[in-house]
UniProtKB/Swiss-Prot annotation:
Its main location: membrane. Keywords: Cell cycle, Cell division, Cell inner membrane, Cell membrane, Cell shape, Cell wall biogenesis/degradation, Glycosyltransferase, Membrane, Peptidoglycan synthesis, Transferase, Transmembrane, Transmembrane helix. Residues 40-58, 105-112, 170-172, 218-272, 338-348 are periplasmic. This is Probable peptidoglycan glycosyltransferase FtsW.
C-alpha cells in the first residue's frame, strides 16, 4: 500500500495514511475550489455585488472540513462503534428538527436546512453518515442473526424505513436514494444470503419507482429526462442547458473562466451542475480527470475497508464500505444527472460542488477512510509481528 507515515513526537504513535486516497481527495477539493470560483463569479457579482463571494465561502467551508478531518483522524474507530446508538439518535433528531416550523428552512419547496446564522446545516447530510455508522455497528453486533434469520435481516431495514419516511417528508428524494444504496450495499457486503438480498433489492427498486411516479413534480422530471428537448424551456430546461455545456466543451474545453452557460443560462451552475461547467471549460479531458480521481478515491476506500476486514476489524470494514458507498453513490448520481443519464435530482458533487454541509461531511468521510486505512495497517503489522514475539519467547526458554 502506498502510504504516508506520520509520527506523533509526544507519544510516539504512528499513523499511516493511504496516499492515493489522500491525494485524490485533495485533488478533487482543489479542482472544486477553482471551478466553484469560475462558475459563480458572474452570479455572485449580480446577486451580492461581490464576484468572489462564493469562492470565499467555499474556501471557508473547505478549511472547516479539513479541521473536522484532522479531529476525526485522531478518533479511534472504536469510539464510533461505542457511540452508534447516540449517532442514530442524532440522525433522527436532525431529521425531525428540520420538519418543525420555525427551525427548518424551506428553499425551492423543500425543507432540508436548519439555519444557524452564518451556516445552514443540511439535516440529511449528517443523518446519512450517522445511519451508515449505526448500520456498521449493528452488522458487527448481530452478524450471525443478520445472516441466519429474516428478523435479524429486517431490523436494520426498519430503521432505514424510518429514516426514509423522514426524508420524504422534507422532501429529499436524492438523499433517500443515496442512503438506501449505501445501507443495502453494506448488508450485501456483510455476507447475507443472496435470496434475501435479491428480495430486498426488488423491494427497494420497486419502492423507488413507486415514489418516483407518486408525485407530479417527480413524474414531470422523469418524463423530461426521457426527452428534455421536447420541453426545453420548462421541465427540460436545466438538462438541455447542461447538455449544451457538454457540447461546447468538446475535447479540451473553451478555457477556464470562459463558460457561456454559467452566465445565467444553467441554473445551479456552481452547485448541482458544476460538472457541466467543468465539461464546458475543461472539455472531455477535464471531465475524464474528475471521473478518474473519483475512481481512485472509491477504489482506495473499498481497498482499505477490505484490508480492515482481512485484519479482523469488522466494524472498521463495514463503516468503510458504507462511507465509500455514500460518496460513490452521490458522485455517480450527480454525474448521471449532469450528463442526462439519470433524471434531474438535487445532489451535489462530493468535494467539488459549493455547499457547506456537503463539503464538510465529504471531508469527514475521507478522514474516516484514512483512519480505517491507518488502523488496518496497524492491525496487519500486529498480526505479522505476533508470531515473531512468540518465537523469541520460545528461544529464551
Amino acid at each position: 500500500m502506498s502510504a504516508l507515515t506520520l509520527t506523533a513526537s509526544k507519544n510516539t504513535q504512528t499513523m499511516t495514511l493511504d496516499l492515493p486516497l489522500l491525494g485524490s481527495a485533495l485533488a478533487l477539493a482543489a479542482i472544486g475550489l477553482i471551478m466553484v470560483t469560475s462558475a459563480s463569479v458572474d452570479f455572485a457579482d449580480d446577486a451580492n455585488g461581490q464576484a468572489l463571494y462564493y469562492m470565499w465561502r467555499h474556501l471557508t467551508y473547505l478549511l472547516a472540513g479539513v479541521a473536522v478531518g484532522f479531529v476525526i483522524l485522531r478518533l479511534p474507530l472504536e469510539w464510533w462503534h461505542k457511540q452508534s446508538w447516540l449517532l442514530l439518535v442524532v440522525a433522527l433528531g436532525f431529521l425531525v428538527a428540520v420538519l418543525i416550523p420555525g427551525i427548518g428552512r424551506t428553499v425551492n419547496g423543500s425543507t432540508r436546512w436548519i439555519s444557524l446564522g452564518v451556516i445552514n446545516i443540511q439535516a440529511s447530510e449528517i443523518a446519512k453518515v450517522c445511519l451508515a455508522i449505526y448500520t456498521a455497528s449493528y452488522l458487527v453486533r448481530r452478524l450471525d442473526e443478520v445472516r441466519g434469520s429474516w428478523w435479524g435481516f429486517a431490523k436494520p431495514l426498519l430503521v432505514l424505513m424510518l429514516v426514509a419516511l423522514l426524508l420524504l417528508m422534507e422532501p429529499d428524494f436524492g438523499a433517500l436514494v443515496v442512503t438506501m444504496c449505501a445501507v443495502v450495499g453494506m448488508i450485501f457486503l456483510s455476507g447475507v444470503a443472496l435470496s434475501r438480498f435479491a428480495a430486498l433489492l426488488m423491494f427497494c427498486v420497486g419502492s423507488v419507482a413507486l415514489l418516483a411516479v407518486s408525485q407530479p413534480y417527480r413524474l414531470k422530471r422523469l418524463t423530461a429526462y426521457t426527452d428534455p428537448w421536447a420541453d426545453q424551456f420548462d421541465s427540460g430546461y436545466q438538462l438541455t442547458q447542461a447538455l449544451i455545456a457538454f457540447g461546447r466543451g468538446e475535447w479540451s474545453g473553451v478555457g477556464l473562466g470562459n463558460s457561456v452557460q454559467k452566465l445565467f443560462y444553467l441554473p445551479e451552475a456552481h452547485t448541482d451542475f458544476v460538472f457541466a461547467i467543468i465539461a464546458e471549460e475543461l472539455g472531455l479531458l477535464g471531465s475524464l480527470l474528475i471521473i478518474v480521481l473519483f475512481g481512485v478515491l472509491l477504489w482506495r476506500g473499498m481497498y482499505v475497508s477490505r484490508v480492515a476486514e482481512r485484519a479482523g476489524q469488522l466494524f472498521n470494514a463495514y463503516a468503510g464500505y458504507g462511507v465509500t458507498l455514500l460518496l460513490g453513490g452521490q458522485a455517480l448520481i450527480n454525474l448521471g444527472v449532469n450528463t442526462g443519464l439519470l433524471p434531474t435530482k438535487g445532489l451535489t458533487l462530493p468535494l467539488i460542488s459549493y455547499g457547506g454541509s456537503s463539503l464538510i461531511i465529504s471531508c469527514l468521510c475521507v478522514a474516516i477512510l484514512l483512519r480505517i486505512g491507518s488502523e488496518a495497517v496497524s492491525g496487519e503489522q500486529t498480526e505479522d509481528e505476533s508470531p515473531k514475539v512468540k518465537n523469541r519467547g520460545g528461544a529464551q526458554r
